[in-house]
């Protein structure tokens, strides 16, 4: 089995396991950070390839078609971990669009591939995503809503890259007397 085929297979299993647990809904935002260098077993930022980026992008687009989620592709630290998204998403949520074109050496291979293969791509600096996937320890946490909840899948690596995934939940607020699940005794005034 070639490395690319293995990467595709691992990604499919990981996304399927994730969706089974997280149950993402249509319209929710899914952020992806990825080091294609790490996927190939190299140090982050040193050996990114468009071939690996294409394989990962196509699997993520397939996941998007199946679930109706919106994708956000995190750039590397050279672009302050900005994100490539469809213009329609940026306009819908009034995300501020910034001017930069990701390239493999300043943006990363996956974000660059996304920028050249989305319908109408733009780059934004900030987002609060509902869930996400981190391939190669790229640190997507800054782009997740509070509170992040880790999701464990059967896949621990994509290629040679460590993979983590998370969904989010609303904050539990209110202190000692707060109630988080409605029960008969909590909805009556006796």
Swiss-Prot record:
Record's signal peptide: none
Origin organism lineage: Bacteria, Bacillati, Bacillota, Bacilli, Bacillales
HAMAP family per record: UPF0340
NCBIfam families: TIGR01440 family protein
Species of provenance: Bacillus anthracis
Name this polypeptide is given: UPF0340 protein BA_5559/GBAA_5559/BAS5166
Family: Belongs to the UPF0340 family.
Segments forming a coiled coil: none
UniProt superkingdom: Bacteria
Pfam families on file: DUF436
């Amino acid at each position: 089995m070639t490395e690319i085929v293995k990467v595709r297979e691992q990604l499919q299993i990981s996304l399927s396991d994730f969706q089974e647990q997280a149950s993402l809904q249509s319209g929710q935002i899914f952020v992806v950070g990825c080091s294609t260098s790490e996927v190939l077993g190299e140090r982050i930022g040193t050996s990114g390839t468009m071939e690996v980026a294409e394989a990962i992008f196509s699997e993520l687009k397939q996941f998007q078609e199946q679930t109706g989620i919106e994708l956000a592709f995190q750039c590397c630290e050279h672009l302050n971990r900005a994100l490539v998204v469809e213009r329609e998403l940026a306009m819908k949520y009034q995300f501020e669009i910034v001017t930069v074109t990701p390239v493999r050496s300043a943006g990363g291979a996956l974000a660059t591939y996304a920028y050249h293969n989305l319908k109408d791509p733009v780059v934004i600096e900030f987002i609060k995503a509902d869930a996400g996937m981190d391939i190669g320890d790229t640190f997507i946490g800054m782009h997740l809503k509070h509170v992040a909840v880790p999701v464990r899948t059967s896949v621990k690596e994509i290629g040679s890259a460590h993979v983590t995934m998370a969904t989010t939940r609303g904050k539990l607020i209110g202190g000692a007397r707060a109630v988080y699940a409605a029960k008969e005794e909590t909805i009556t005034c006796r």
